[in-house]
Amino acid sequence: MSKAVVLNENFEKASEVALPEHFQGINPHNLYLYAKAYAANLRANNAHTKSRGEVSGGGRKPWQQKGRGGARAGSIRSPLFVGGGVAFGPKNTKNYTQKVNKKQKRKALEFALNEKGEQGALFIVDSIAVESGKTKDAAAIVNKIGARDVLVVKENIDEKTFLAFRNLPNAYLIEPNELNAYLAAAFRAVVIERPVWEKIVKEG
């Protein structure tokens, strides 16, 4: 069974707690679908090409239909010509948004956290706060976790803690409403404040 590592106030291992049963046996396809939708919804969709009807010019037939020995043509803006429109090119009007229902989103997060638990990379701590506001103090916390990159979930982020974590390239500080399966799976370790963790378990 997957377990979360409980840390003391010095961010050292104090004990372990088993993850709830409803975190177990979830189909990993839920995570795939959520990650796919999350990435699609981030898509900027800026690529756009003009079709033959949108390119300026080309209203006149360039040469007579018959008698030249060459192929017939109705417009110099045909995709066959240099300077012509693009056939089947990308359009910025296309909608790439994908929807994921609430239950599936929930199961994806539970699966991602369960995976972190199996890897020994899910940590629970009573409070995450850097009162000094110094980056070196936040870096010391991350170093104690011992992972290449860390997702830190804190309720009501104060300014000092925000400033301390802001410049760390290997740590990402978020509030509970920002936590999702994509982020939980992307980082090597996840550190969650106890009140946030209890809320996650209760909502499951």
Curated annotation (Swiss-Prot):
Keywords: Ribonucleoprotein, Ribosomal protein, RNA-binding, rRNA-binding. GO terms for biological process: translation. Residues 48-73 are annotated as: Disordered. InterPro entries: Ribosomal_uL4, Ribosomal_uL4-like, Ribosomal_uL4_dom_sf. SUPFAM superfamilies: Ribosomal protein L4. Part of the 50S ribosomal subunit. One of the primary rRNA binding proteins, this protein initially binds near the 5'-end of the 23S rRNA. It is important during the early stages of 50S assembly. It makes multiple contacts with different domains of the 23S rRNA in the assembled 50S subunit and ribosome. Forms part of the polypeptide exit tunnel. This is Large ribosomal subunit protein uL4. The lineage of its organism: Bacteria, Pseudomonadati, Campylobacterota, Epsilonproteobacteria, Nautiliales.
